[in-house]
Amino acid sequence: MTRQRSTRRGAWRALRTIVLLGVGLAVVTVGGPVVYQRAMSAGLMYRVDNAPVRDVALVLGAGVEPSGRPSPYLAARLDLGLALLQAGKVRAILVSGDNGERFYNEPDAMRRYLVAKGAPADKVIADYAGFDTYASCMRADRIFGTTSVIVVTQTYHLARAVATCRALGLDAVGVGDDTVRALSVDTWRWGQLREVAAAVKMAGDLIGRRQPLLGPRETSLDAALGR
């Protein structure tokens, strides 16, 4: 009987140790990237009025409606990009999004929206392979030749976007939108929750030095910047 109890105690201790190790690993796996992105972006997130001057507003893509119009989230990002251009904080806008399907084209929708709002057409450059934040940041440097950017997205995404760009060598700061939160608090909270998993993916991309779709060097942004 004593031996059985001892065996059971040993089994429970082993199980408890395994559970604690698993919890600890989960905390490090999830918590580590979140802490990293906050540290990398600390003091680098601004409003339009107090943002430092950079060459380019890098506006990250989001959903486009079936009509071809930017979703409210994307429109809010584009409005910030235009405000930065009009305030003289940037000299050009790089719209970077998904064009991976025949009838879905974020960059063209973004560019049309900005030009219709008064942005000079020659100052709005489209990146058609910005399939995620990591790709958009890397392509801004490798394909479009700029490292001086203000990243524009929603505020819950901003720390990761700035951290990713800076980890890839860009002199990046960020300006974020939170006006769309009023449209649906649940949608906003879901976006915040998704950022936890996205932070882990960011860490994997950076550690593994993932190579997104690149291609030949583009000169359209050089022309927009007059260089």
What are these regions (language model features)?
Residues R209-R227:
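Short linear elements at protein peripheries
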Residues R189-Q211:
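A transmembrane-helix-recognition feature enriched in membrane-embedded lipid enzymes
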Residues R3-D49:
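N-terminal type II signal-anchor transmembrane helix
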Residues T2-G10, S71, S148, E195:
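A general, composition-driven signal for non-globular sequence regions
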Residues G100-E106, V173, V196-A203, T219-A224:
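A general structural signal for short secondary-structure boundary/capping elements
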Residues V35-L193:
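A structural signal for short, hydrophobic/glycine-enriched beta-strand patches
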